[in-house]
Every structure is written in structure tokens, then in C-alpha cells.
Amino acid sequence: MERKQKNSLFNYIYSLMDVRGKFLFFSMLFITSLSSIIISISPLILAKITDLLSGSLSNFSYEYLVLLACLYMFCVISNKASVFLFMILQSSLRINMQKKMSLKYLRELYNENITNLSKNNAGYTTQSLNQASNDIYILVRNVSQNILSPVIQLISTIVVVLSTKDWFSAGVFFLYILVFVIFNTRLTGSLASLRKHSMDITLNSYSLLSDTVDNMIAAKKNNALRLISERYEDALTQENNAQKKYWLLSSKVLLLNSLLAVILFGSVFIYNILGVLNGVVSIGHFIMITSYIILLSTPVENIGALLSEIRQSMSSLAGFIQRHAENKATSPSIPFLNMERKLNLSIRELSFSYSDDKKILNSVSLDLFTGKMYSLTGPSGSGKSTLVKIISGYYKNYFGDIYLNDISLRNISDEDLNDAIYYLTQDDYIFMDTLRFNLRLANYDASENEIFKVLKLANLSVVNNEPVSLDTHLINRGNNYSGGQKQRISLARLFLRKPAIIIIDEATSALDYINESEILSSIRTHFPDALIINISHRINLLECSDCVYVLNEGNIVASGHFRDLMVSNEYISGLASVTE
């Protein structure tokens, strides 16, 4: 990973720590460092005690023995206490960082282009956050404890052993560090790559499971348990195979690290046994060396796996940050948004395609004026919904230009555009929360009186012959309400906004003709100066439009009043004859 990317990664993690988070993190580093030094000294103290008891030291005194015993007990107790305290600090830091990261991620999702939001399902999106959160936890935990502690212990061990003038043991410990670093540096890249591949497949499996749950009704209606089971089983098999490859290489690395430890630590062990037998090494020194071997062997052997885990987490987290980096570029705001609420819309030579093969819109030009209602109609796939999605800012990669009062749409920020244009679609976007919450989406400061007023305008003041309750809890996708009732929630949101342009993309299709006409009348009364664009095939809505545009294969093929088009346009006359 490049140095610049690493710095960006560490800056991102550091930015997730507030003052309390920084205090917790540096406290963890301090506790780990202090406890590691204390643990490293304990074998030396034990060696002194052993030599005193065995008579190897001539200056024996009970006071000195008691002092050493107290110091050794302090080392043991402080080690236990530091583990407990570290766990508390680590848990607090994780909660602290996870909260800030989740809110940051929510802002980043909110600021993403709508087309990007629709690429992945909720399962993939939420699991990405969980994985990134886990990556940060792995990095913080390993750096502050699992890597730092063995490194300090190894350095302290060499210093202590050198102080006893055991040059051979100190040299072997140093050689072990050198060989270990070279060996694991070469292998951790492969381990990290396999681990990242395994995590990516796990993420895809989770996304597939979420997709299956979302579409379970379709599977059930088609008796397709076998098909969806096979699909998910294939994903789990791929996940299993990827994990097997990772753990196989990880086991080999661990085995090689163990062999390295056995060879080098074993040579130190044998050297000191021979020293004791030859009378040149004291029993206490031998116990100190063996204590260091026991103390260091397991944590150091695990460093290889930990390094690969760290590299994988860094790579995965860097990708997450790159995908969800906040867009700090600010678009110029529209001066008239805070002054004039009347907007005219001009479209010039607008073309759009989802691929290079076929244009969905082909050089469309038209002028729409404030206070008027326009209807777009035409066969399925003619480009109606695509046109209004471009106007509302859903698609950015179009050719030509769109102007609001002579200001190009490209120069208008998403936030300002959302204030200027309200786009009602067939998608209800109902949250699993109360009716009150679902309506406050449109106006955070809306009072209960205002909410009840807009519910009445949307013909939703009564549900199941009872007055509606704002505390009604809506289930997944609002499915405890009918299709028409969910569309009325969307309409009620409209009445809580103050848009200059209103787009209705068949958003009243689940309502009957009477309710639809009443609501459209309420919209025109409530927003007398608004420019209204309506997509519909219903005659009653086309009749009350100031102008109807007929689209076919991405072109405007006819325009005018409905009565005139009944005579001159085959598609409109066909709609009228079907209705009759």
C-alpha cells in the first residue's frame, strides 16, 4: 500500500476519534506499553528470587527476598489488572468510534448520487459498514495490543538478557526477530490477498441472502425453493472454498513460525541447560530464559497472522473509504431559491442513453412555465420517466442542457434542487417507523397540526374507518397499509414541502379516479404557482392539463391540448377509445 494511501487511512481512523476517543486510544497504548515492560521484567525478578533461595547469591537477606517477592506479585497483579482495564477502554473506544463512523457513513450515503445508491441492496450496504467497522476495530486492537505488546516484550527481553551478559541468548533473540520479520514480510502479502478475497465473497453472500429475503414472496409464489436454495448454496460453497485457501496458507505460516521458534528458542534453551550443568549459568538465569521463551513464543508466532490481518483490513478499509469518500465540492447555490418561488423550465437538445446502443431520449427540447400543468404520455419505454428523472437530478450523464430560470441544472446543488423540485414516484419509500417520522421526512419542524392538515389534503385523515394516529408503526415497506394509503403518505409529504416544480410520475396510480381527481385539485389549489409535470395514461388527468406531450422512442411526436390531440394523434385517440 502506498505511503500516501496509508496516511489517508490513518487520518481517516484518527478523524473518527473525538477528544474522549483520543484519550481512550492513547490510554490503551500507555497501558499496553507499561504492562509489557512490567511483564518483561518479571522473569528477571523470578530469577533473582530463585538465586537467593538456591544460595547462588552471597548477599542473602530476608528483606531483599520479601521486596523481590512483592515486586513479582505486583507484576502478576498488574498484568491481570491491565488486561481488565484494557478491555474496558477497548470496548468504550469501539462504541465511541462506531457511533461516529456510522453517522459519517450515513452522511456519505445521503450525499451520494441517487444512481449509485440504487446499485447495491440494503444487505450489501449495511454489511459494508459492518465490515469497515470491524476492520477499524482490528487495526486499533492489533496496533495497540497484539503487535505492540510482543514487540516491546522482545526489545525488553534483549535489553534484560544483555544486562546479564548472556551474549549468546541475546544474539539468538535478536536473530529470531530479524529472520521472523524478513520471513513474514514476504508471506503476509499473500495472506492479506487471500483474506481480502474471502471477505469480499462473504460480503457478496450476505448481499445475495438479503436479495433472497427481499424477493422471498416471488420465490414462494413460484414454488422456487430449490432454485433459491441452490443459488445461495453456490455462494456459500464459494465462500467456504475461499476461507479454506486462506486458512490453509495461514496454517502453513503458523507452522513455519513455530518451527523457527523451536529451532532458535530451542538452541537458547539447550545452551542454558548446558550452562547450568557446567556451572557457568545459575538456576535463576535458566528459569529467566525459559520464562522468556514461554512468554514470547505464542504471541510472537501469532504476529505473522496478525500482520496479514492488518494488511487485509488496511486494504479493505482503504477501498471502503475510496468508495464512500464525502464529496466536499460545493455546487453554487441558486439565488432565487430564497427569493422567487416561481420557476420556468427550459430543455434544450436533451439526449440520454443507458448504453451506447440506443438513445432513450433524442434531442428533446421544450419550454414549461410556472403555474401550468403539463402531462407526459406515450407507450411504455418511450422515455417519460427517464426525462423527469433527469429533470429531478436522478441522472447526471446527459447531453444537452436544462435550465431553471436561465440557470443550468448542472450548476445547481442537489440540496437546492430538492428544495425546488418535488418528485412523486410510484416508489413509496416507507420507513419502518411511525407515521409521524415518515411525514417529518418532508419537514423536520412540522407540528402535529400541520401534519394532520396535510393528511386531510391527501385523504388520509381516516384509516379503516378510524381517525389516523401519528404513532401508528409502519412495518417493512409500509405493508400494513394498502397501496393507495402508501401513495397518500407520499402525497402528504408533498404538502409539507414548498416546491416550485412538482413532478408526478404515476404516483396516484393506486387511487381511484375520484380520489385521484380530488388530490390533483388539492395540489393545484395548494400550489397555485407551481409548474406541474404529470406522467399518466388516464384520460381525466390528461383532460385537465394545460398541455399534453406525447413521447415515442425518445422523441416528442405530438403536443397540444388533449381535445385537439384526440383528433390528430393516434395514441391519444386510442386511449380515449379504450376509456369509452
Curated annotation (Swiss-Prot):
Primary location group: membrane
Molecular function via GO: ABC-type oligopeptide transporter activity; ATP binding; ATP hydrolysis activity
ABC transmembrane type-1 domain location: 25-312
Signal sequence, start to end: none
GO process terms (BP): bacteriocin immunity; bacteriocin transport; protein transport
Keyword line: ATP-binding, Bacteriocin immunity, Bacteriocin transport, Cell inner membrane, Cell membrane, Membrane, Nucleotide-binding, Plasmid, Protein transport, Transmembrane, Transmembrane helix, Transport
Binding site for ATP: 378-385
Membrane topology: Multi-pass membrane protein
Domain ABC transporter: 345-578
Entries under CDD domains matching the protein: ABCC_MRP_Like
Keyword presence, Ligase: no
Localization (cell): Cell inner membrane
Record has rRNA processing as a keyword: no
Record InterPro entries: AAA+_ATPase, ABC1_TM_dom, ABC1_TM_sf, ABC_transporter-like_ATP-bd, ABC_transporter-like_CS, P-loop_NTPase, Type_1_exporter
Homology family: Belongs to the ABC transporter superfamily.
Quaternary context: Homodimer.
Function of the protein: Is able to protect a cell, which harbors the plasmid pTUC100 encoding microcin J25, against microcin J25. Is required for microcin J25 export out of the producing cells.
Protein name, per record: Microcin-J25 export ATP-binding/permease protein McjD
Protein species of origin: Escherichia coli
Lineage: Bacteria, Pseudomonadati, Pseudomonadota, Gammaproteobacteria, Enterobacterales
Gene that specifies this protein: mcjD
